[in-house]
């Protein structure tokens, strides 16, 4: 199961863990993903999407229909 946002396609990013002695080691910053169920009135159905908290805020602001239209234009199969 990929740790990717179903709407934006964003996955984990890489960076460094920095200790007190300033020694750096590689690490991954994982997305804050949640599996949510959304109702799409125009299609009269529910969809289950794995979305990050950032995407969830965008959906609350713009609405699920507008966000899905943008994602489909960018080539994501939602």
UniProtKB/Swiss-Prot annotation:
One of its GO terms (biological process) is translation. Belongs to the bacterial ribosomal protein bL28 family. NCBIfam families: L28 (TIGR00009). Gene3D superfamilies: Ribosomal protein L28/L24. PANTHER family: 39S RIBOSOMAL PROTEIN L28, MITOCHONDRIAL (PTHR13528), LARGE RIBOSOMAL SUBUNIT PROTEIN BL28M (PTHR13528:SF2). InterPro entries: Ribosomal_bL28 (IPR026569), Ribosomal_bL28/bL31-like_sf (IPR034704), Ribosomal_bL28_bact-type (IPR001383), Ribosomal_bL28_sf (IPR037147). It comes from Salinibacter ruber (strain DSM 13855 / M31). This is Large ribosomal subunit protein bL28. The keyword Ribosomal protein applies. GO terms for molecular function: structural constituent of ribosome.
